[in-house]
Amino acid sequence: MSQFWGEFPEAVINTFQRLQIALIGDIKKCPLSSPLFPELSKLDAHSQHHLLASFELPRFGGVTPGVMEQLHDAESELAEARARLLRERLHAVANKENIPYLGDCMYYDAPGINQEELLQAAFLEAPTPEWESGRIRPLWPKDDWFRDAKQGPYPEDYGDIPLGDFDNLYRAFDALVEEHWMSVYSTTLNPFALLRCGSEFVEECVVSAGSLIPACMMTDHHLQPTGDRQADKEERQDYADSQDSIQSMGDFWKEFYSKDSGKKIPDSHKSRLANDPNKVGFTKSALFHKQPLAHSLAQTWANFRGTQDKADLVKVTMDMNIEKYTVRLPDAVRTTAGPLYIEWINLPRMSENSARKLAEAGWNNADICGVDLAVKSHIAVGTPVRVIISLVDGACSDMPTATMCAFEVNLAAQNNRSLNLPLLSLPFSRLLADLHDFQHRVKIACQFRDPEGFNVGTPMLSFSSLEFSELKQTAFERNSLLRDSWSEIEKRACHGGGRCVASQGIVQTWEKEVNPPLKEYAPLVLPPVPQPKRNFIDQQSGEVVRPLIQKSRSMRFKSPSDLWSRPSVDGGSTFTLSPSRGSLRCDNVPGCAYEVDPLHLLYYELVNVPKDTLGGTLLTRIDVRAKAATFDSAVWRQWVRDGCLKPKIKMRITAATSCFSGIVLGACLDAYRRIPATTKTDFTASLVTGLPNIVWATRDTSEIEWDIDLAAVCGHTFFALEDTFGYMDFLVYVLRGNEVTAVADWSIYVSFHVDWTQESMSATLIPTFVWPPEPADISYFKEVWGPYHFTLDGTEAKESFSLMPGMAIPRGAQTVRTFPRVLAAHFRSWTGKVRMSIQEVSSIFLTGTYMVGVSWNATADLTDITTRKHWIVKSGEVFELDLYCPYGENPTFTGLVNGIPYIIVHRLGGIIGPKDSVGTFGFMIHLHGLTGVYKNPTLHSGDRSVGSAWFRVTNILDDNLVFNIPGRIEDMVAVAGKYEVTNYANPTSMLFSVTGLHGGFIRLHITWCPNTSLGESKGTLKYMQYLYHTTTENFFGDQATRGIIDQNGFTVDLACGDFFGATRVGLKGEVERLGIYSSNAKSIAEIRVSFEILSMKFYGSTIRVK
């Protein structure tokens, strides 16, 4: 019995079981021995009766393949109807229990009622509202004949239906099961069923289906929840639209291929595929007629005399818009029907200058007539992966309408070529909006089918495009040169035995040879999308007016954010897109409030701030994963259900603007807990700048939204029920304290909202860094410095900062190493400019202007700076500072003799403020990266294969030496009383300490020397490689025994990483290791271990505090 039937009352199940048997034949004459039953028995009961009733198989006929294919489509419809029924029943239960509705989701805020109880209540018979009684109950029959047929009690208010009036009885059944159940049940009660089953079964169906009435009859009365959070009419309409927002690919193609093109060329939307890419292709002569010579001469003469009719002016162009574009496998979009792999690409056009010149020359329209696409596959021959490539009109949000032409290709073949006729006319104009349309309106969409097993970011295909267009000066178009039919075009596009095949027919040809059969595409999810709202300024009042725009109920599809965007061309008006799901603000409208959707809320917390708070104070450390488990929100349950996910978190912090306090707050993500839990004070920018962080001043900011993609930042997924590779620890702290004590303690509202992007079958995702370092890696250098201050009386008016990208950041008695600085430490020098800005953070009543310059020493004063290249800047202005030096290149680490480059910030104008101002004038410095590199930096060693020192073992006190080298690079710790270990620092080993995870292969170089004379030395040194190790079982790798006197030592390759492919410093788990043993260890003076990286991937950037 299908699971689908489990949600229906038993009476309905029994009814349709009997109905199904009756449809096959008389039970007495034809028991279950019919030849039809073996095939039907493979299907669920609901599909069986749907099959028999829909196709009216007479008696004992077999099930043909065509029928089976239609049956699978019917099963998909049943699954969609089941989901809709469940949502509607939940609405009914919530309405009855007065439970607030939280949006289009199966979760409700029901205090005292858990989700299991709520679902159970939804599957029970829901109450019939009073308003329904007048419409439904009069249709029920009450005749004795009907009552005797069922042999059971019935309500008295059935209404009047004459005996044997099957038409009214049929309409009553229609009213009961409503619109979306008609496709399932109406075919059951066709004339064939009535004749074969008799009236008893039909009437029994009507009575049994009565329990479905309350759940099925969902109108606006049901969809509107009770309580304080009443949905308005548009929101209820959006919900109703969303229930029909899933369109299967089969339905889409059926609608697309059956539509009338309404264009000059019939079936122009049906692209053509070439059987041989070298023998088929568009040319000007294939697409366009040639003008007669006499007509061309007449046009030339008329143009010379100035009597040329502009309606006759046509110019044919051919442009190679794309020489090569590589399409990589995108992240899947999570939908209710499965993952959707789709990549959107702008079809490049001519440059803006070229378009302007054509417009100035009088050409006003460009008709895109043909696009020739050559597709090159980048996957192995024979791999069963298909892709739908569509040319889409980006100005339309209805998928079947927006798709101008489409085709499907087999990537198992290395080369494919398609001929497409989009037939889209675009205007030439000097207006910015028209130019934007011309350059960005045409999109190419690539939807992959069954790409399982391929990693995100894998190059799947590349394509080149030729575009053929007609340029015209008017809209009359009476002299178009485009040919009139596909057949005429194909004759001239094919040569040397080439031929074209319709795109919808070629798939079945090669699909027959694929075993196992290919999976179907994921259905397109087409949610309703609000139209962009155009604001305008009232010329009399000067206020921003937001007109009401009727929402569209058409089917929508997801696409890039710039699909509908365009610059404003209306003078004096403002234009904004409708806020996206993650964006809340409408900053261009003064006093604009915003609504928060609680369905994405993972956790929130109120953080207390003391009224006399001091700089460096930690306000809170929030373990979001652990807190969310106790908070038990809807997105938490989704996380638990799906396992490993790649979350995008929006951290929303709401406080209040304080223009006088001078407080600077900050937040950071410590994904690997490198800041000790005991650290409660002394939080400075130097400590957190190497972590993902955000800084804001309360003088001008009361609320911030910090979007952070944890999968991109950390390079791995997160599991709901425990901490695996990293932590979701967010810290909130004070970087600069009060200038003026607040009136009382105050609070900050911190909330975390999650958008699950895709579940992942792999723990590690795209690495943050792949060995070896490249010259461009030094540009990763981005930091925040401060806070710094100038005194209000002018005694302190200069700050100087040394810029050594490869050095650790000093922090009192400690140092902090960051991932960008360790990367920079691999290079000896660097060149270029520093992109930076200054942010004022003190009281809003204090302002100033700064002069920023460069000095080769820290003693430069204002006079020295003004004689060199410098910048005069204000708060918030971004500029690029050229760090020129006497040697042409800047060192990345401290130069003991040559000097250090310094950035000098000098007060220039100000500081200006009220008489009673107190405190100091504070500011932060933001480094946005290194730009303008004019010479590639050089590595410390020209040969990257040279090993890096790891550690050495000395002062061995016991002859029996045993120590293990793990398959991860970390600081080695000595066994107390046995020997001493010295760890070495170098850029390569430090790289492992400032990243989250690492996985790859290293080669160990191990050498040793005796501490006695050669004649007295004796004993051996052995090693054993453990591939797998437990207390009861070992898998062994390489092994060897060497004498104490050995000049060469030995090398061993070791894998770094646990079973999931990576590991991290201090992570518990089973990794490969190398055991070192000796029974004559006192004879060894020292053992030295170096390593060489063969291949390595690093995931996530962090810091190391030492």
UniProtKB/Swiss-Prot annotation:
It holds the Pfam family Nepo_coat_C. Residues 224-243 are annotated as: Disordered. Residues 224-239 have a biased composition (Basic and acidic residues). GO terms for molecular function: structural molecule activity. It comes from the Viruses. The keyword Transport applies. InterPro entries: Nepo_coat, Nepo_coat_C, Nepo_coat_N, Viral_coat. GO terms for cellular component: host cell plasmodesma; viral capsid. GO terms for biological process: transport of virus in host, cell to cell. Specific enzymatic cleavages in vivo by the P1 encoded 3C-like protease yield mature proteins. Keywords: Capsid protein, Host cell junction, Transport, Viral movement protein, Virion. The keyword Translocase does not apply. Belongs to the nepoviruses RNA2 polyprotein family. Virions are comprised of 60 copies of the coat protein. This is RNA2 polyprotein.
